[in-house]
Regions:
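Catalytic domains that recognize anionic headgroups
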Residues: 2-16, 20-22, 34-133, 139-553
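Charged, amphipathic alpha-helical stretches
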Residues: 23-31
């Protein structure tokens, strides 16, 4: 007779499996099929070749099982074991799909991207392969876990056995590391991205880092910035106020811009407008979640990543100087960059430019005068900084980002499983997004030109990060910065100044054209925008103002 209260009397039969039996099978399942992306990468790197490679593979397999067993040993309690196994199995299946399909890795930044994904972006990532992988590798094993009876144990006995499992598994892991130290350390040193493929330990580590951030950074504190900011003398000298549009591009890579030497004519409209394109521009992150807050910060990439408190940003300083600021979004939000300035979503339900919950970027030009007119009159008459956050080239559904009229390069990839398309189809779909971005930016400049009688107008465009299009079997973006390929970090940066803005800023397009090969980074954006808008503050650093070399007082 079974005692279901958690103890068994003498002579009673014990029903169900020991908890460690479930843990062992789950650890083996996740270490093998749940790490398909890891095993594929090790094979493609020829790290599993020969007897030495097989030994390394066996060591990595045992190490994965041991670490997973140690993790599960901490959770092997009656109320938590099956929920924990379910979460890890489903997480492992999700990780397998994305790492195997898109060749991405899962670190804290990538997990942040996942947590901030909106429904539209999530839909683009789902398909038959997604659901099949989650079902076969996650949900069906989870059902098996719940259908398997587990032997009840006294709390004291369970605690002792759990402790023994954790210590034994860690001892086994340490033994494997010591025994395989030379080949293992060599593999990790020469192929640093491999460590981010250990599934689902990579997600557990990433979530742990995210959970620890409040201990490293006081999120409740927001330090004021540039409280001494004032408008410079140009505001008294020039009758017309400045109107600057800052377009924060999405997932555009410099290599595919015709302006930057790309063989295809992806940017003919901008080329005809004689804009200045800075060809050596670099992002401070490889994802929107990392780059967007960083590029609006005065700290620069290194200091921003290690900051202990949050600090106000460029938009706060501009607004504090008495200017009107508006954030217009056709994307997934501003990542708190616009938290203290007016912000609006560009989408207009029922508009022909919108379908399926998404809009083409030209929607941001519709009703723009009315949006600006609604800003505070006193600030608006002094000057306006309008930040546009377009959909741009956001993947993997590149084919959704360009209207039919701008699909110049065909056939294009129409799948969200990019590896299912040929390289040419994938590049065609991406290049069509750049062609549409070209048209959108040219249309924005045309809108600005039409208002030159009332304002001194300018446009600055810079992308948040780049994109991988199958080079080295990598897709999308978000690799850790230290190991990310240049195509995920090298971004387009374009400036256009009207003649009126040239006069008020003392910066000429002719001079800027002499600087197009100078290296610039997102670290320059904060100071360059203050310089263009003639906002004086102690936080401004002239050496980081990319336009300062051309500015004539």
């Amino acid at each position: 007779m079974v005692n279901l209260t958690g103890s068994a009397g003498a002579g009673q039969s014990i029903a169900g499996r020991h908890p460690f039996w479930l843990i062992g099978w789950a650890a083996l399942w996740m270490a093998s099929l749940g790490n398909a992306a890891l095993w594929r990468e090790l094979a493609q790197l020829h790290l599993l070749d020969g007897v030495g490679g097989l030994a390394l593979g066996a060591g990595i397999g045992v190490l994965l099982v041991a670490l997973l067993a140690a993790l599960l040993g901490l959770l092997a309690w009656r109320a938590t074991l099956k929920p924990a196994l379910t979460l890890l199995l489903v997480a492992s299946a999700l990780g397998t799909h994305f790492m195997f399909t898109y060749h991405v890795v899962l670190d804290a930044t990538m997990v942040t991207n996942v947590l901030q994904t909106n429904p539209g972006e999530a839909r683009d990532l789902m398909g038959l392969r997604f659901f099949a992988t989650v079902l076969l590798l996650g949900l069906l094993p989870a059902v098996w876990v719940w259908r398997t009876p587990v032997r009840p144990l006294r709390v004291a006995r369970r605690a002792a056995q759990n402790a023994a499992l954790v210590l034994g598994a860690l001892a086994l892991a340490a033994t494997v590391v010591l025994a395989s130290y030379q080949p293992l350390s060599s593999a990790m040193r020469n192929h640093r991205h491999v460590r981010y493929l250990a599934n689902p330990l990579n997600m557990v580590h990433a979530l742990g880092r995210l959970a620890a951030r409040p201990l490293q950074r006081d999120e409740s504190v927001l330090l004021a910035l540039g409280e001494d900011a004032q408008r410079g003398p140009s505001y008294a000298v020039h009758a017309r106020p400045p109107l600057l549009v800052l377009v924060v591009g999405e997932t555009a890579r410099s290599a595919n811009f015709g302006l930057n030497g790309y063989a295809r004519p992806t940017t003919p409209e901008l080329a005809a407008l004689n804009v200045v394109s800075f060809r050596n521009a670099w992002a401070c992150g490889t994802s929107t979640a990392a780059s967007l807050p960083c590029m609006f910060s005065h700290l620069g990439r290194s200091a921003f990543e290690s900051r202990s408190t949050n600090v106000e940003n460029l938009l706060d300083v501009l607004q504090g100087a008495g200017l009107a600021v508006l954030w217009l979004d056709n994307q997934s939000g501003c990542k708190d960059v616009c938290a203290r300035v007016p912000a609006q979503a560009a989408a207009v339900p029922g508009n022909p430019l919108c379908s399926g919950g998404e809009c083409f970027d030209e929607i941001m030009l519709q009703g723009l005068d009315q949006r600006i007119a609604a800003l505070a009159p006193q600030q608006r008459t002094r000057g306006v900084v309008l930040v546009m956050h377009p959909m741009g080239s956001h993947g993997p559904a590149y084919h959704k980002r360009s209207p039919a009229a701008f699909k110049r390069f065909m056939p294009e990839c129409a799948s969200n499983v990019l590896s299912d398309c040929s390289t040419q189809e994938l590049v065609n779909a991406y290049d069509n997004t750049i062609a549409y971005t070209d048209h959108f930016l040219a249309s924005t400049i045309a809108w600005l030109k039409a208002r030159e009688g009332a304002a001194d107008t300018a446009l600055v465009y810079v992308s948040d990060h780049g994109e991988s299009l199958g080079e080295s079997n990598l897709y999308l973006h978000g690799l850790p910065y230290a190991i990310a390929p240049d195509v995920q970090k090298h971004v387009p940066w374009i400036t256009w100044l009207s003649s009126g803005f040239e006069r008020r800023s003392g910066t000429t397009m002719a001079c800027l054209r002499q600087q197009t090969d100078a290296r610039v980074t997102h670290d320059n954006l904060f100071h360059s925008m203050l310089g263009l808008m003639d906002v004086r503050s102690s936080v401004y650093r002239r050496e980081l103002d990319m336009h300062a070399v051309c500015a004539v007082p």
